[in-house]
Each structure stands twice: as structure tokens, then as C-alpha cells.
Amino acid sequence: FGTVSGSAVANVMTTGAFTIPLMKRLGYKRAFAGSVEAVASTGGQIMPPIMGATAFIMAEFLGISYLKVAMYALLPALLYYIALFLSIHFEAKKNNMHGLDRAELPKVSTVLKERGHLFLPLIIIIGTLLLGFSAPFAALCGIASTIPTALLRKSTRKHINLTNILKALEEGAKNTVTVALSCACAGIVIGVIFITGLGLEFTNLVLSAADNHLFLALVLTSFAGILLGMGMPTAPAYIMQTALLVPALVKLGVIVEAAHMFVFYFAILSAITPPVALAVYAANGISRASIWDSSLAALRLGATGYIIPFMFVFGPSLLLI
């Protein structure tokens, strides 16, 4: 869900309502259950095939197709989720916990038969992109396919009525306005940065503070990226970081694709980084745990996410470049 919505908080509130109570029932601590949901939801924006709106903005900045951005993101995203899965697995082993009884597990074939058709809009979007059409056209095709898709099965056909269609259009318009306003405000900030020369000054400041040492510059950039992204949607946070932070990394010899992916990661990870960890706060509303316990657990579970950007800067082959 997170890879489609492009919002860690929205993902937490949607899927967390089911997953967090289930994890608590299986024996996981409240803080751990909430942090798992927050970290997993945050990673949705780095996992192809959709990756939210920010990946499309990156494609525009780099002047490449969205599919290349998805290719760059694939291996790092897999590492992120493998590390998260192993952390959860070892936590379960440590506390001698077991999964659901086989009788409680739904059959995959039954689920696919009843709900598998709901993947069609996503398949259409990906297929349209693979055929070389633009991202807006792919999104339009995906939206247009939702109603015919829902009509394919009786279980989803009952939800198709004028009230629900109008409600969906209303929610879509609200989400569009939120993203558009955020990007517009970020655009104003970027305009000021270029007019005043602040971007160049910031680049020189990072280079001077790091004394031209790449690793130190990356550490400073990661801290700045998290600070700029705190409490902000990923898209405007990424746009501002592109103007302020990417030029400094490129000057130090980082390839431009890796530099963009680096700031992209830290714009996203601000959602699980205290003190303004919005995804953790959202999960905490469901888990009812201590916010600091949840934040520390999220930092521990998401630690790989903070390391991976350094890995692909020093080893760009991880991005399949």
C-alpha cells in the first residue's frame, strides 16, 4: 500500500489498524508492534514499482525515465526489507513466539480468487510505463480502470455507487491539492535559494565543514536532510534537499544519480527519526505505547535504512548503474 500511496503516515493509518493489533495479539510488545508498522510503511516510498510521487519528481530532475529510477531503487529497497524481516524474526525467536495457527491463515488461492483482480489497476499502470507512455497518462489509465475492475467481482461490485465514486474523487482532489501546495511552497523556497545564492553558500559551507572529506560530507548532508524533512511530506522535502544538498555531493565526486537517491532516502527516513517522527506518532496512536519507546524501537529496526545510502554512494553498482 505504501508504494502506491507515497505517504508513510497514510500507510500506517490504513494497514496499521489491522497489523498492529495482530502483532500485539501474537505477543509483540506495543512499542515494537508500532515501530514495525512505522518502519515498514516508511519503506513503501523506496520500494518499486510505484514509490509515490517523489520518484516521478526525481525522474524529471534527472531527465530520465521513471523506470530507471525504479531500477536504481530496487536492490537497496530489498536490503531494507530483508533487514526488517530478519529483525522481526529474531525478536520472535528471542521471545519464543509463534505465528498464527494454520486454521486461521487464509488460503492464498482463495484470497487471489476473491480479491486478486484488484491488482489490475497497478498492473495497468506498470504496463503503461513499460510501454513508454508518460507517468500522467499511466496514472490516468490506472484511475480509469478502477471502476471496471471493481465490477468484475460481486464482492467488490457492491461498493460501486455514485456516493462512493464522488467520495473517491473528493479524496483524490484533496490529496492532489496537498501535494500541489507543498510542491508550490517548496518551489518558492528554491526560487529564493537560487536568487539569493544561498544554495552556493550552503554547498561551500558543507565542503568547508567537511574539509573535502566525502564521508564527513555525507554525514553532514544526512543530518541536514533529516532536519529539512522533519514534519514535511517527502516531495517538498526532497525538492529542497535537491537544491541545497545535492550540488555539494556532486562537487565531491558523487555521481548525480547516487546523490539524488541519497537525499531521497533521508527525506523519507525523517518520518521515523525523533523528535518529529510522524510515522511513529501515527502508529503510536494505534499501539498506545510510549512514544519514546516506539521511536527508539523504530530507529533500531530502521537502522539499515540509514546505512544503505552510504553503501550506494561508495558503491554505485548497488543502484544497478
Predicted stretch roles:
Residues P136, T163-L200, L214, L218-L227, ...:
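Core transmembrane alpha-helical segments of multi-pass membrane transporters/permeases
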Residues T42, A53, I57-F61, L122-L130, ...:
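Alpha-helical transmembrane segments of multipass membrane proteins
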Residues A59-L75, P247-A258:
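Helix-coil boundary and interhelical linker segments in multi-pass alpha-helical membrane proteins
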Residues L26-F32, K113-F119, A173-V179, L205-S222, ...:
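Membrane-interfacial loop-to-helix junctions in multi-pass transporters
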